Amino acid sequence: MPQKQLILASTSKYRQELLSRLAYSYSAQAPLVDEEKEKDPSLAPQALAEKLADLKAASLKAADKVVIGGDQLVSFEGRIIGKAHTPERAIEQLMSMQGKTHDLITAICVYDGDKKIAYTDITRMHMKKMTRAQIERYVQLDNPIDCAGSYKIEKHGIMLFDKIESQDFTAIQGLPLIELGKILENANL
């Protein structure tokens, strides 16, 4: 039986770096999904992350492929906090969350041919009380405009938090490698 091709349905450099830690040969491809068009405001944050991860993986699935799709978002006070896209918006997002707790939701969906395996990690993030000047300094350091919640935990973003409650620290960065590793072991790659 020929070996299946492993595909990461993502152009995220963060997810690519993470997947490389599992030591599988893979290729990264842009998912064939218009993410903005698929965002349904009526869905709960976890359901939305799971839907987007599924759509991304499903868009590239094939019998001879194992395809990984992922999505990550922040749920804060009943609303979704997405990517800021500008430093000013990142500062406002962080100011609104400082001194409070939010959920970082990381969903993955893996298609092994037609077989679907899904997993969601929810991490409780307890942000410190901070001044605007401290937050502005952080945004200058990391420029986290392309990250859900406007922080890069793998860089200086760790200084924003009092406590992080997580089953898998790599989920915070974009892929829950502990669970993904188990899924891929069973995929006979």
Swiss-Prot record:
It is found in: Cytoplasm. CDD domains: Maf. Keywords: Cytoplasm, Hydrolase, Nucleotide metabolism. Its EC number is 3.6.1.-. One of its GO terms (molecular function) is nucleoside triphosphate diphosphatase activity. InterPro entries: ITPase-like_fam, Maf-like. One of its GO terms (biological process) is nucleotide metabolic process. The active site is at D71. PANTHER family: 7-METHYL-GTP PYROPHOSPHATASE, BIFUNCTIONAL DTTP/UTP PYROPHOSPHATASE/METHYLTRANSFERASE PROTEIN-RELATED. Nucleoside triphosphate pyrophosphatase that hydrolyzes 7-methyl-GTP (m(7)GTP). May have a dual role in cell division arrest and in preventing the incorporation of modified nucleotides into cellular nucleic acids. Belongs to the Maf family. YceF subfamily. This is 7-methyl-GTP pyrophosphatase. It comes from Bdellovibrio bacteriovorus (strain ATCC 15356 / DSM 50701 / NCIMB 9529 / HD100).
